[in-house]
Regions:
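Alpha-helical transmembrane segments of multi-pass inner-membrane proteins
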Residues: 22-23, 111-118, 131-163, 170-239
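Transmembrane signal-anchor hairpin modules in multi-pass inner-membrane enzymes, especially those
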Residues: 1-92, 100, 121-131, 135, ...
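Residue-level signal for alpha-helical context at structural boundaries
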Residues: 42, 56, 151-152, 164
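Short aromatic-rich membrane-water interface segments that cap or initiate transmembrane helices
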Residues: 92-107, 165-178
Length: 239
């Protein structure tokens, strides 16, 4: 009985660790992120099935499923047989560009639908802790911000990746996605800070975090993430 309880706790701990460390996988690259995602989903489904956890699909879930099916079908028709929409006779096998395999790329998107449903179930069971995710996001986004700033002033980041003339990607190397990463995870960082830090001088540290991320976004060379960041900050403070 004790072994079963310990095994259950270990499974929960594994799921929690995998969930909270997603920001780290984003930095590590697409391959590790994909592996991380698959392990998390499989571990979560195995736990849900083992514990006989049931859940009811709500309207929002059905809308999400319909959206993914619609996107999958439209993408498949558009890339595999574009003439089908104009009523042309299509040689389905011969016209499919298997070298690019967009149907498989489209099908892979379904994993995010499964991820959303799994996270919903685990969150309703109070297995996932968002505060820990916020904290890891704060650490990761702050690290990327500091690395981008270091690269801007020194020509290379701490991993010896060189920056371009007008772009600084920090730990992402040749992929110019530092701005996109900071824009997405900066809000999780700010939410994490607001949720975890309730001490004196809170506003000073909050301003420091915002300025740090904003400056890193500015020198990363990604203009749209910078605009979205300021728009998000504006909406955050007026809501």
């Amino acid at each position: 009985m004790i072994n079963l309880k310990n095994q259950k706790l270990n499974q929960i701990k594994l799921i929690q660790i995998l969930f909270c460390t997603f920001p780290i996988s984003f930095i590590a690259g697409n391959l590790l992120l994909s592996i991380h995602l698959v392990i998390f989903v499989i571990s979560s489904i195995f736990y849900i099935k083992k514990e006989n956890i049931t859940f009811k699909l709500e309207i929002a879930h059905w809308l999400l499923i319909i959206f993914f099916i619609y996107t999958f079908l439209i993408t498949t028709i558009q890339f595999q047989a574009p003439g089908f929409l104009q009523g042309k006779n299509i040689n389905w096998v011969g016209s499919w560009p298997f070298e690019s395999k967009p149907i498989f790329k489209s099908f892979i998107l379904i994993r995010y639908l499964i991820l959303a449903l799994v996270v919903h179930v685990l969150f309703t069971q109070k297995i996932l802790d968002l505060k820990k995710l916020f904290l890891v996001s704060l650490i990761c986004s702050s690290f990327v911000s500091l690395d981008v700033i270091f690269q801007y002033y020194n020509g290379v980041d701490i991993f010896n990746f060189k920056g371009a003339v007008d772009r600084n990607s920090g730990p992402f190397g040749d992929e110019n996605i530092a701005g996109s990463f900071l824009q997405k995870f900066s809000f999780l960082s700010i939410f994490g800070f607001l949720a975890l830090y309730n001490k004196k001088h809170k506003n000073i540290f909050l301003i420091f975090i915002i300025v740090l991320h904003a400056y890193a976004l500015l020198i990363s060379g990604n203009r749209m993430p910078l605009i979205l960041f300021f728009l998000g900050i504006f909406l955050l403070f007026i809501i």
